[in-house]
């Protein structure tokens, strides 16, 4: 009989400016945990346009910063960022670009991954941001998966959520459909991770 610890953890890695992407991460973690699998939520520090450091190594509050070891040892990955001119934030991109050692080792090959985002408007670049976050995951050899239309909330949502990934339109709290889509996405990554591990 396999225990929860046998399956490792799903890393939910995000950057959030105003808390919206963090809220998505928390809902995704509920979906992961519903499969008796650990959801490990991590964030990345804000980067600055000036040379001196503006962030300490340990955040003052909230989720702790992700390390390369967190990324290396995950059984599956969810990556989230607010939309910045139709692409991911510089802070998240900076962290992902520091993972070349894992690319050389093939540490993330054949692990499932998904993406999520938040924007200030419905046509604020959500889909292009989701696609931009998929690119480094594909280079790492990960198995990128979105949300199928068998998830009913995907056809009903009037705000965020797409087959490319979970999302939110800012201006109010997450809608019930957005929450359902996040949970379904987290659950799907966890189920795929368990299934792939059982094949090894």
Model-predicted segments: where are they?
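Short, flexible, mixed-charge acidic loops at enzyme active sites
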Residues: 54-56, 155-167
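N-terminal beta1-alpha1-beta2 submodule of the flavodoxin-like/Rossmannoid cofactor-binding fold
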Residues: 1-105, 168-200
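Short, glycine-/small-residue-rich phosphate/pyrophosphate-handling segment
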Residues: 109-158
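Alpha-helix boundary/capping detector
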Residues: 97-100, 104, 121, 139, ...
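Gly/Ser/Thr-rich helix-start
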Residues: 20, 77, 81, 87, ...
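Short, charged/polar low-complexity linear motifs in solvent-exposed/disordered segments
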Residues: 105, 127, 133, 163-164, ...
């Amino acid at each position: 009989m396999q225990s929860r610890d046998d399956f490792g953890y799903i890393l939910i890695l995000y950057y959030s400016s105003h808390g919206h992407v963090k809220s998505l991460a928390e809902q995704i973690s509920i979906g992961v945990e519903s499969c008796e699998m650990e959801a490990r939520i991590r964030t990345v520090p804000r980067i600055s346009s000036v040379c001196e450091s503006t962030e300490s190594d340990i955040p003052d509050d909230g989720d702790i910063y992700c390390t390369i070891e967190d990324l290396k040892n995950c059984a599956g990955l969810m990556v989230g960022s607010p939309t910045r001119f139709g692409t991911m934030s510089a802070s998240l991109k900076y962290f992902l670009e520091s993972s070349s050692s894992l690319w050389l080792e093939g540490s993330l090959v054949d692990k499932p991954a998904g993406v999520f985002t938040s924007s200030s408007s419905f046509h604020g670049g959500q889909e292009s941001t989701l696609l931009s976050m998929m690119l480094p995951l594909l280079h790492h050899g990960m198995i990128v998966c979105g949300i199928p239309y068998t998830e009913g909330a995907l056809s009903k949502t009037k705000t965020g959520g797409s087959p490319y990934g979970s999302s939110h339109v800012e201006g109010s709290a997450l809608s019930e459909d957005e929450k359902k889509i996040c949970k379904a996405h987290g659950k799907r990554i966890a189920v795929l991770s368990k299934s792939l591990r059982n094949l090894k």
